[in-house]
């Protein structure tokens, strides 16, 4: 079995953490789901685009998927910052997610800027 890259590991961890947070928040206050949905979509899109890039049809397709993942990571960071200020995400989880995203953004940036 092929070794999983650090980028894939981090994007999987991001996805797992955001899904767990989302499921918990929806049980607490379903009425707020429209505020939580954008983070769920953008965070899971990071990993999905990284996974798609592994099967890219060309170098241009690969770079495009990684650029989309980079943009989605930036959007995820935006939502985390605002949901933390709104007290929808606790500081410990926020710090963990922001650290993961910083690592992911750095790795993606170095990949797309080659």
Residue ranges and their predicted role:
Residues 1-114:
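Amphipathic alpha-helical assembly/interaction segments
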């Amino acid at each position: 079995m092929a070794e999983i890259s650090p980028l894939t590991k981090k994007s999987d961890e991001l996805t797992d953490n955001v899904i767990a947070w989302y499921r918990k928040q929806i049980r607490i206050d379903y009425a707020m789901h429209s505020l939580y949905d954008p983070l769920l979509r953008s965070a899971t899109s990071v990993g999905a685009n990284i996974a798609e890039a592994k099967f890219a049809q060309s170098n241009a397709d690969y770079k495009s998927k990684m650029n989309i993942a980079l943009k989605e990571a930036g959007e995820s960071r935006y939502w985390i910052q605002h949901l933390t200020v709104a007290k929808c995400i606790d500081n410990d989880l926020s710090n963990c997610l922001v650290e993961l995203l910083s690592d992911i953004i750095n790795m993606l940036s170095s990949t797309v800027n080659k």
